[in-house]
Structures are given as C-alpha cells and as structure tokens.
From Swiss-Prot:
A GO biological-process term: cytoplasmic translational termination
Source species, domain of life: Bacteria
HAMAP family documented for this protein: RRF
Protein name: Ribosome-recycling factor
Molecular functions per Gene Ontology: ribosomal large subunit binding
Protein task: Responsible for the release of ribosomes from messenger RNA at the termination of protein biosynthesis. May increase the efficiency of translation by recycling ribosomes from one round of translation to another.
GO terms for cellular component: cytosol
Chief location category: cytoplasm
Amino acid sequence: MTKDVINNMSTHMDKTIDALRKEYQRVRTGRASTGLLDEIKVDFYGTPSPINQVATLAVPEPRTITLQPWDAKMIPVIEKAIMNANLGLTPANDGKVIRLNIPPLTEERRKDIVKQLKKLAEDAKVAVRNIRRDAIDELKKQEKDKKISEDDLKRAEKEVQDVTNSHVAKIDEVFVHKEKEVMEV
C-alpha cells in the first residue's frame, strides 16, 4: 500500500525534474542549442507545425544553428516565425540554409539569466514539496482508514522525506550545471 504511494510520488517528482530540464533547454545561454527553437511553430501550408518538422536543425559550431528547410519556399516563412518568437536572433539565409548566429551574452545578461534559472529551480522545488504533501496526506488517510498501522505511517513518512530530499538535490544539481553553462564565457 505505502509502496504504491511512494512510487507514484517519485514518478511525479521525476516528471517535475524532466520539466525543469526541458524549461532550461529553452533558456538562451550564449551557446547554440536546437532546444531554443522547440516552441516555434511554422505555418506549413495552412497547418501550424513545429519547426523541426519542416527543416533539419543542426549545430555546426558552438554559436551557430543551421536550419535546412525541406522545401526552399519555406525559408521566408521560417525566418518570419523565428523573428516573431522574440528570441533576439536574426536569421540569415543563402537560399538553401538559414543560419542563426547566437551573440555572446553580456555579464549583466548572464546574471539575469541565472536569476531566471534560480526561479525556475525554486518553482520545481515547490512542486516537489507539494507532491510530498499530497503523498503524506494520502498515507495519513490510509492510516485513518486502518489500511496501514501507525508504525507503517512513520516509516513511510521517513521514506517520503528521503525521496523528496534526493529529488530536491537533483534539482540543485541541474541548476548548478546550467548556471555553470550560462556563466562560462
């Protein structure tokens, strides 16, 4: 009974960490990453499509992203979508390939990005703690309904706290790694 609650809680916490990592991919760090373009939709013959479904994305150099549309007529549409996404990137094309040069970040901008990353990490920690609270509430309900003993409840609460602590540590680890990447010149 308690194992199910703890496994379910752990799965939800893992999803929270995955969501944080995905969110961090979208943050511009001064280094090229195709993750910057994940949320951009392009009008592909009347259908809004993710940019990676209308072009091949590549990172040939640390500060350059290239997009090679499968249909050359899509170049202006893709460029417009990138401009409208307000990423601070200006596309340049040679008729076949679109190039996005990632400008280096200023020290002030790096610090702002780190603040943004810290807030995202704190939000993830709050989500993990809410998941912990829900799990403990479920365990207390089971104890009240006499499905588990008081000793089982105490043991399970300790295990819930241990799992929570390990997930909070993972969030800190993800944050520190991304912070290093952003502050690297």
